[in-house]
Amino acid sequence: MDSASHITVSVVIPTRNRPSLVTRAVASALAQTYAAVEVCVVVDGPDDVTISALQQITDGRLQIVRLPQNVGGASARNVGVRNARGRWVAFLDDDDEWLPKKLEKQMMMAVESPYEYPILSSSIIARTPHGEFLWPRKFPSAPLSEYLLARSSWTQGEGVMQTSTLLTKRELLLRVPFQDGLRKHQDWDWLLRSVALPGTGIEFVQEPLAIWNVEEKRATVSTTSDWRYSLEWIRQSRLFVTRRAYSGFVATQLGSQAAEQGSWNAFVPLLKEIICEGEPKPIDFCLYFGMWLLPGRTRRWVRSWANRNQLAVAKQRMTGPTMA
């Protein structure tokens, strides 16, 4: 750890109108066992309440950047990267938290990486209204687009590289910034474009280092945007995804969105998209039809039932058996 402990890591946290959540996120970043940390909170638009809450934190490692108008999460992250003083940048969403050794463990791996531009991620504890789950169930593999976008089972959490787990060099983020104005799929978009750059590779810490607070009832861009927006994004990303990944994304992401919105006129066109533009596997058809035929509440119950013991089993695997 000595070779990495002096290297400054800048933590970029975009936020808007969530003072109680962002102060919790900041506290988890400032509580890292890795000492060489600065925290850059980008307040995305006029927000006096959040500014006031952040100003109560007296730690000199906290930097507050105020934006005069709302620009969205992708652009706010880019502002944070440009203001960062560290050689490395880690991202943290304002409603998530880090475990204390997150940066320490990732930086230990980062300095040993053979890649010029390593992108580090980790397992994550997904905290949902239905319980806690340890994701991902599979660790990253090539091609990355299939790992992220295609599924091989009924349950969620197979391929996950959540934004709050990401750490990489600031230089890479300046060369490949987040796509300004992109409302959805920001992390997938950045990851897929970044790994296309020579010298870039994925490094993964297999233990959970962050908590992803998943609130299914909270309205977000991801839950309110029309499915057509996601279709346009995947079409524009064809150079970065395999045909298998394309089919998987349309089947699960677009199928779920269109079904939730009751857009039955999209059923046949999306099915044609899966078949004609991709290379689907049987699981893609099963998932697609399931999205339309099973109500959202039923699908969530099935996922919860299938995964309910996962976190306990994983914790036992990491800590060893309990002695009677």
Give residue ranges: language-model regions:
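Flexible acidic/His/Gly-enriched loops in nucleotide-sugar-dependent glycosyltransferase catalytic domains
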Residues: 75, 103-172, 223
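Acidic helix N-cap motif at the loop->helix transition within catalytic regions
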Residues: 23, 47-56, 97, 101
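A conserved acidic beta->alpha catalytic loop
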Residues: 28, 35, 43-52, 69, ...
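Conserved nucleotide-sugar donor-binding catalytic segment
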Residues: 141-227
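C-terminal subregions of glycosyltransferases and related glycan-biosynthesis enzymes
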Residues: 196-202, 206-324
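Short aromatic/hydrophobic "clamp" motif used to bind/position activated sugar donors
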Residues: 89
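Glycine-rich, basic loop-to-helix element that forms the pyrophosphate-binding segment
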Residues: 67-84
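N-proximal low-complexity "stem/linker" segments adjacent to membrane-targeting elements
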Residues: 1-30
